[in-house]
Amino acid sequence: MQLTELIETTVVGLGYELVDLERTGRGMLCIYIDQPAGIAIEDCEKVTRQLQHVLTVENIDYERLEVSSPGLDRPLKKLADFERFAGSEVVITLKKPLDGRKSYRGILHAPQGETIGLEFEGKEGAAMLDFTLADIDKARLVPKFDFRSRKQ
């Protein structure tokens, strides 16, 4: 079983989604998990304990294990991510330029089959970009911050 498959099976078995996995040259293994309700420190601890056990049993070599949430600027990698975050503001970087641009920022539309839509501000007003997962180099949510006090 490959490392990604092993980790994903473990993470999903605990009720979380594996968002991303990074392995650095210094033996650091970074795992990013999520779930619809969000991630708390206890969730990271739970996954860390289970992964430490699994990685030891499977004799996977690593120096340090880090489990965390993907953050406010969460990467979008799977079609399900684009569906879940439809209506959110995102930044998309394409592998190849389209109309002289690779980077777009706009409102994500729900996928229609394999096609994903992005409404963005073009040179002549609102425009629509249609693309597939294969066209994307990177896609991330744009963080939303609300600094207004809850008191009125």
From Swiss-Prot:
Q: Could you tell me which SUPFAM superfamilies the record lists for this protein?
A: YhbC-like, C-terminal domain, YhbC-like, N-terminal domain
Q: InterPro entries under this entry? A: Ribosome_maturation_RimP (IPR003728), RimP_C (IPR028998), RimP_C_sf (IPR036847), RimP_N (IPR028989), RimP_N_sf (IPR035956)
Q: Which UniProt keywords apply?
A: Cytoplasm, Ribosome biogenesis
**What Pfam families does the annotation carry?**
DUF150_C (PF17384), RimP_N (PF02576)
Coiled-coil annotation reads: none
Which compartments does it reside in?
Cytoplasm
Q: Which family does it belong to?
A: Belongs to the RimP family.
Function summary = Required for maturation of 30S ribosomal subunits.
Name of the molecule in the record:
Ribosome maturation factor RimP
Protein's organism: Paraburkholderia phytofirmans (strain DSM 17436 / LMG 22146 / PsJN) (Burkholderia phytofirmans)
